């Protein structure tokens, strides 16, 4: 039975802004929180974006990371008469939450990310002096380029994609929905320093322990067209696994300082990173009705890939990836590119590198650290400006795409590669959103914004303590 958004929320007895709505079904359908190791310390280090205690499993012979079950992103503008007072109050609220929950999936992950508008409006002089600099982008353009720049529309983005201007985005992750609800209450109901602009909710994992799998069950419950076609046990609405361990950047690789791509004046932002946030709808029905399994595999990975029927988890290690020459040769031969293959031309290390802390990163190592999650928001769970954001009543399959890269430009290089615009300057002759372009034929990006994630020590109103 197809349920409207209103009916789903009415069935929970709570409102959109205060409750989780349809996402309360996650715990019922998943059968509780995933098994996690109980022998863990607090899990919090210098970085905000890293989460300790993530479960590792083997699926189809491939190591896979199982992310926290529940996710929420809240965007907001700053409402503060005194930044000094606001900083103290926010830090006290965060300390309260961290004393209550460890920084693990079983506890609570909290990541504060700050947008360009915050730095321009509240700390412009301090930002001009101390914002991290993207050395690679600066060298290419011949001018100084900040590691954080405004988001742009890409070739395959619709003209109506909204480039957002939020001051802050707060990412909350936990296996326990109650922990996220508690953090939401503390940070946005009790604390008076933010005005919410949107709430974005969703889930991850839930497809590796047998049975139908969480994405399929949730999509069916929401009445998503084509939901019954989602393969049982899938991690994502589109059927394939995306959290292969070797497909995600390891530990500190996305930190500003790790690869030498970005420098941080006076070291203020060392231990920080860049975060891109976007919402993308997925046409599940078109994906399964118009693409046979073989074409789905070639679209998701690369043309010519040989997978057994029904395979969902595909190796993505350094030996299984594609470079620019591979992608160009394949395109010349087949007229198409695969999603993963195209991305890998920019998202993987072209040579072995030694990090600032001595860590050796082999050639082919992934750089981006993704934290995206499935959603039925359309496009958000709640918006302060529903008309502008295009809020719709019916749930829609999609993803809130959250990814950590060393800089805005590093993210953009990878996203352009998805459109056939490779890092070496090659632009493949692909019609935007065509089937030749991989997933783009069935994806539509509604919103985008870039953010800077400070290290934990500077997470509360960064640079504001330097104002005089």
Where are the regions that the model predicts?
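N-terminal secretory signal peptides
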Residues: 1-3
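Long, histidine/aromatic-enriched segments associated with O2/redox biology
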Residues: 7-468
């Amino acid at each position: 039975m197809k349920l409207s958004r209103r009916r789903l929320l009415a069935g929970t007895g709570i409102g959109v802004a205060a409750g989780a709505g349809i996402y309360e079904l996650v715990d019922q359908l998943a059968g509780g929180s995933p098994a996690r190791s109980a022998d863990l310390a607090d899990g919090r280090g210098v970085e905000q974006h890293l989460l300790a205690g993530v479960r590792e499993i083997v699926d189809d012979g491939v190591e896979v990371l199982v992310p926290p079950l529940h996710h929420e992103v809240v965007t907001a503008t700053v409402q503060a008469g005194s930044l000094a007072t606001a900083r103290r109050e926010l830090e006290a609220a965060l300390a309260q939450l961290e004393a209550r929950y460890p920084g693990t999936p079983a506890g609570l992950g909290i990541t504060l990310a700050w947008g360009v508008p915050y730095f321009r409006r509240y700390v412009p002089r301090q930002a001009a002096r101390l914002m991290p600099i993207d050395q690679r982008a600066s060298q290419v353009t011949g001018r100084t380029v900040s590691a954080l720049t405004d988001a742009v529309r890409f070739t395959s983005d619709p003209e109506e994609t909204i480039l957002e201007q939020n001051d802050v985005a707060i990412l909350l992750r936990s296996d326990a929905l109650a922990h996220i609800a508690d953090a939401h209450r503390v940070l946005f109901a009790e604390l008076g320093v933010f005005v919410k602009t949107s709430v974005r909710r969703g889930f991850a994992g839930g497809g590796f322990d047998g049975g139908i799998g969480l994405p399929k069950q949730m999509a069916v419950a929401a009445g998503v067209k084509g939901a019954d076609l989602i393969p049982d046990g899938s991690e994502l609405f589109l059927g394939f696994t995306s959290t292969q361990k070797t497909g995600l950047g390891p530990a500190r690789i996305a930190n500003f300082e790790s690869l030498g791509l970005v420098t941080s004046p006076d070291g203020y932002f060392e231990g920080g990173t860049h975060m891109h946030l976007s919402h993308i709808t997925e046409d599940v029905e078109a994906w399964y009705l118009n693409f046979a399994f073989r074409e789905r595999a070639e679209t998701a990975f690369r043309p010519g890939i040989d997978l057994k029927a029904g395979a969902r988890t595909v190796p993505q290690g350094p030996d299984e990836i594609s470079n620019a020459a591979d992608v160009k040769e394949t395109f010349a031969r087949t007229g198409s590119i695969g999603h993963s293959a195209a991305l890998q031309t920019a998202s993987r290390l072209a040579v072995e590198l030694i990090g600032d802390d001595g860590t050796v990163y082999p050639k082919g190592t992934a750089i981006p650290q993704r934290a995206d999650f499935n959603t039925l928001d359309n496009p958000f769970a709640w918006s302060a400006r529903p008309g502008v954001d295009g809020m719709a009543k019916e749930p829609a399959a999609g993803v809130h795409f959250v990814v950590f890269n060393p800089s805005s430009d590093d993210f953009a290089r990878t996203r352009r590669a998805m459109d056939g615009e490779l890092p070496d300057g090659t632009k493949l002759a692909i019609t935007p959103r065509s089937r030749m372009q991989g997933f783009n034929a069935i994806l539509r990006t509604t919103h985008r914004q870039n953010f800077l994630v400070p290290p934990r020590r500077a997470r509360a109103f960064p640079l504001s303590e330097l104002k005089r």
